[in-house]
């Protein structure tokens, strides 16, 4: 049974990775990739991915649809909590003042945290509510494309 569970979880993780990269987010798997991506000029949205139900049912759909907006971040990236542990830990170092949370979204500008949408603002909400929250941040902090 353990072998079946591992195969199942590998499929869940693979699908979760594919969903977010298909939405245009660049996957960061190492601390070095995180540093390179999060210190770029401009605004960066980080989606902290996970395998929980609220990630698949709410956060990833919101990540996909929120960026179809007049104003949006310059860069879209993702780290995977529980999978790419070192990359996720490094990303969280940039989220100063916020506790670890997954799934979650962090909006940064020039490597500095602006705002986060934490798990408690995702879990139990409809995807549209999270999309609206993200687009509100884009409206406030991002440039029109």
From Swiss-Prot:
Pfam families, sorted: Disulph_isomer (PF06491)
Coiled coil region boundaries: none
Gene3D superfamilies for the chain: Glutaredoxin
Domain of life: Bacteria
GO biological process: cell redox homeostasis
Family, as annotated: Belongs to the bacilliredoxin family.
PANTHER family: BACILLIREDOXIN BRXB (PTHR40052:SF1), UPF0403 PROTEIN YQIW-RELATED (PTHR40052)
Name by which UniProt lists this protein: Bacilliredoxin BLi02578/BL01507
Organism ancestry: Bacteria, Bacillati, Bacillota, Bacilli, Bacillales
């Amino acid at each position: 049974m353990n072998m079946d569970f591992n195969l199942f979880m590998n499929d869940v993780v693979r699908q979760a990775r594919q969903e977010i990269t298909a939405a245009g987010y660049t996957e960061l798997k190492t601390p070095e990739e995180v540093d390179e991506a999060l210190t770029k000029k401009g605004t960066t949205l980080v989606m902290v991915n996970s395998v929980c139900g609220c990630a698949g049912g709410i956060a990833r759909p919101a990540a996909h649809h929120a960026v179809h907006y007049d104003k949006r971040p310059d860069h879209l990236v993702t780290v995977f909590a529980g999978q790419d542990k070192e990359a996720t830990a490094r990303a969280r170092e940039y989220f100063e003042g916020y506790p670890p949370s997954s799934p979650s979204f962090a909006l940064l500008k020039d490597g500095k945290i602006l705002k986060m949408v934490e798990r408690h603002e995702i879990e139990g909400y409809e995807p549209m509510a999270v999309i609206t929250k993200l687009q509100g941040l884009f409206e406030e902090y991002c440039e029109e494309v």
